[in-house]
Swiss-Prot record:
Cellular location(s): Cytoplasm, Cytosol
Pathway(s) it belongs to: tRNA modification; 5-methoxycarbonylmethyl-2-thiouridine-tRNA biosynthesis
Main location: cytoplasm
Official protein name in the record: Adenylyltransferase and sulfurtransferase UBA4
EC numbers on record: 2.7.7.-, 2.8.1.-
PANTHER family, sorted: ADENYLYLTRANSFERASE AND SULFURTRANSFERASE MOCS3, UBIQUITIN-ACTIVATING ENZYME E1
Listed InterPro entries: MOCS3/Uba4 (IPR028885), Rhodanese-like_dom (IPR001763), Rhodanese-like_dom_sf (IPR036873), ThiF/MoeB/HesA (IPR045886), ThiF_NAD_FAD-bd (IPR000594), Ubiquitin-activating_enz (IPR035985)
Pfam hit, one: Rhodanese
Active site positions: C218, C390
Sorted UniProt keywords: ATP-binding, Cytoplasm, Metal-binding, Multifunctional enzyme, Nucleotide-binding, Nucleotidyltransferase, Transferase, tRNA processing, Ubl conjugation pathway, Zinc
Boundaries of every Rhodanese domain copy: 332-431
Gene it is expressed from: UBA4
Claim: Cell membrane is one of the keywords in the record: no
HAMAP family from the UniProt entry: MOCS3_Uba4
Length: 433
C-alpha cells in the first residue's frame, strides 16, 4: 500500500467517523421529548452548560444522595428539577416536627414517614421524567458498595465524621466522585472529593478523625434553616457542573467553600492540597480496600471514636417518674441542689424554676475545685444531695461522674433521659424544643 492509498483510507475513516458522530448526535437529540425541551429550555440556553448535549448528560446521569435532611432537602429538588435522570436517596430516618424548619422537602403531614419516601413523593410530582430509587437503610460497610455501584456521583449530605469517612473510602474504591458538605448553626462547608478518581479524598484532608467530644450536631448545636439550605443548594450546583462537564481533569483544582450566614453573610473559597501519596485510601500504597472495609478490618467506630456516656451505675440513675415522685421539679433547699447542665441558651428556652444552670463545659473548667463551684451554688458542699439533668440524659451522666470523682460530692444522681424524658413521661405541658 502506497502512502497515497494510506492517506486516502485515513480521509475515508475521518468522514465515516464524522458521519457516525452526527448519527449519534441525532439519536441523542431524539431522546429529549418536546415536553422536556420546554421544561429544560431555560437552562439549556445558558452559556457553558452544553445546551442539548449538556441536558442529555443530565438525563443519563445517576446521582446518589446520602441523607434527605438539612443538606439533602434543598439539593434534591434542584437536581430533579434540572433533569438528572436517576436519583437514589439513602436515609432510614423518619420525619420529625423538629426537622421542618430546615428540611423543607418534608411537611407536617409527613411527620412519622420515612424521609426517603417523603422526598420521593415530592420529587415525582416535581418531575415525572426522573427515576427515583429509595434505600430506607442505615449506610454501613456491609451495604455501601452495592448501593454505590449503580451511580456516577455520590452526594454526602450526612452529619457525622464516621459516615463521611465511609462514603469517601467506598467512593475511592469504586472510582466515584463525591460532593461533600456539612452545616451547623449559621455556617457550612462544601468540597468535591475524588474528582474523576484523581483525588484528593476525605482522608487526604483529614487523616486523623476529630475528637468525638469536639463534634457537635444540629440537635446539640442548632441550625438556621436558610444557612444550611444555601449550602445544600450549592451542592446541587457543583453536582450539575460535574455532570455537564464544566470541570475536567485539566481545570479542576481541589477547593473548600466556607459559608457563614451570621452576622454578615460571607463566602470564601480556599485552595486545598491534592491527593496525598501516603493516604491510606487513595495514596500510592492504599490499605483501605474494598475487602478491608467489607470484612470489618477497617473499624470506623474505633477510628472515629465515640462519646461514652454510660459512666453511671444503675443506682446512680433515676427514671423521670422516680425523679418526679421522690424529688420533683421544685427540689431545692438546704443541702439540696437541682443542677441543669445544658448550655445556657437551652436553659433559657425552658427549665424547672428551682434548677441551677451550670453548663457542662463550665463545670469541667472548674477542675474539681469545690470553692469555685460554691461561688455559683452557695448551698452546695460535699454532703449535699444533688440531682443532675440535661436535655437527653447524656451530659448529666458525665456531670454526675465529675461531681462525684472530682468534686468529692457523694450523693449525686442523674435523671435518665433528661429534661425531655420528663416532658414525655410526666408533664407534656412543658415546652419541648
Amino acid at each position: 500500500m502506497t502512502d497515497q492509498d494510506l492517506l486516502a483510507q485515513i480521509e475515508l475513516l475521518k468522514k465515516e467517523n464524522a458521519q457516525l458522530k452526527e448519527k449519534l448526535k441525532s439519536q441523542d437529540d431524539e431522546q429529549l421529548s418536546l415536553e422536556e425541551y420546554s421544561r429544560y429550555g431555560r437552562q439549556m440556553i445558558v452559556e457553558g452548560t452544553g445546551g442539548v448535549v449538556g441536558q442529555l448528560r443530565l438525563k443519563k446521569a445517576k446521582v446518589l444522595v446520602v441523607g434527605a435532611g438539612g443538606l439533602g432537602s434543598p439539593s434534591l429538588p434542584y437536581l430533579v428539577g434540572a433533569g438528572v435522570g436517576t436519583i437514589g436517596i439513602v436515609d432510614n430516618d423518619i420525619v420529625d416536627t423538629s426537622n421542618l424548619h430546615r428540611q423543607t422537602i418534608h411537611n407536617t403531614a409527613k411527620v412519622g414517614m420515612l424521609k426517603c419516601e417523603s422526598a420521593k413523593q415530592v420529587l415525582k410530582d416535581l418531575n415525572p421524567h426522573v427515576n427515583i430509587n429509595t434505600y430506607p437503610v442505615r449506610l454501613g460497610p456491609e451495604n455501601a458498595f452495592s448501593i454505590f455501584a449503580d451511580y456516577d456521583i455520590v452526594m454526602d449530605c450526612t452529619d457525622t465524621p464516621l459516615t463521611r469517612y465511609l462514603i469517601s473510602d467506598v467512593a475511592v474504591n469504586l472510582g466515584k466522585t463525591v460532593v461533600s458538605a456539612s452545616g451547623l448553626g449559621t455556617e457550612g462547608q462544601l468540597t468535591i472529593l475524588n474528582f474523576n478518581n484523581i483525588g484528593p479524598c476525605y482522608r487526604c484532608f483529614y487523616p486523623v478523625s476529630p475528637n468525638p467530644y469536639a463534634v457537635s450536631s444540629c440537635q446539640e448545636g442548632g441550625v438556621i434553616g436558610p444557612c444550611i439550605g444555601l449550602v445544600g443548594t450549592m451542592m446541587a450546583v457543583e453536582t450539575l457542573k460535574i455532570i455537564m462537564g464544566v470541570y475536567n481533569n485539566e481545570n479542576f483544582e481541589p477547593f473548600l467553600l466556607s459559608y457563614s450566614g451570621f452576622p454578615i453573610q460571607s463566602l470564601r473559597r480556599f485552595k486545598m492540597r491534592g491527593r496525598q501519596s501516603k493516604c491510606q485510601t487513595c495514596g500510592d500504597a492504599p490499605v483501605i480496600t474494598k475487602e478491608a472495609i467489607e470484612s470489618g478490618i477497617i473499624d470506623y467506630n474505633i477510628f472515629c471514636g465515640s462519646r461514652n456516656y454510660n459512666v453511671c451505675a444503675e443506682g446512680e440513675r433515676l427514671t423521670a417518674k422516680e425523679f418526679d415522685e421522690n424529688y420533683g421539679p421544685e427540689f431545692s433547699g438546704n443541702n439540696k441542689v437541682l443542677l441543669d447542665v445544658r448550655p445556657s441558651h437551652h436553659f433559657d428556652i425552658s427549665h424547672f424554676n428551682n434548677a441551677v444552670n451550670i453548663p457542662l463545659k463550665e463545670l469541667r473548667d472548674m477542675d474539681g475545685d469545690i470553692s469555685t463551684l460554691q461561688s455559683r451554688i452557695p448551698n452546695i458542699n460535699k454532703n449535699s444531695e444533688v440531682v443532675v439533668l440535661c436535655r437527653y440524659g447524656n451530659d448529666s451522666q458525665l456531670a454526675t461522674r465529675m461531681l462525684k470523682d472530682e468534686f468529692g460530692i457523694t450523693n449525686v444522681k442523674d435523671v435518665a433521659g433528661g429534661f425531655f424524658k420528663y416532658i414525655d413521661d410526666v408533664d407534656q405541658s412543658i415546652p419541648k424544643y
